[in-house]
Amino acid sequence: MTPYSALALQMDCSAINALPDRGSVDDAISKTLDHVDKSIAGSKAFISTFSGDTLKLVVLPEYFLTSFPMGESIAEWRTKACIEMDGAEYQRMGEIAKTRGVYL
């Protein structure tokens, strides 16, 4: 087995609770995924430069896309913040993983 590095990516989780509608939530999630992509690219370059290892595994924080429910009912949270397994968010994460050559 070829050695590789893993990264526990630490980042702020932007809460979406106060956002007014699903469109605003989708915009916030998109910005978070932009940040994830840039962070992985930078981390991969740093790890390669200073250790010579290849970054292959990136672990993201729990609730990194939305933060957590704060008083919302299950139905409210489902409508406001949940993502679909075949939705744009997972597709984007797949694209990031493929482009960066990592597993998320």
Positions of predicted regions on the chain:
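Hydrophobic structural segments
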Residues: 1-104
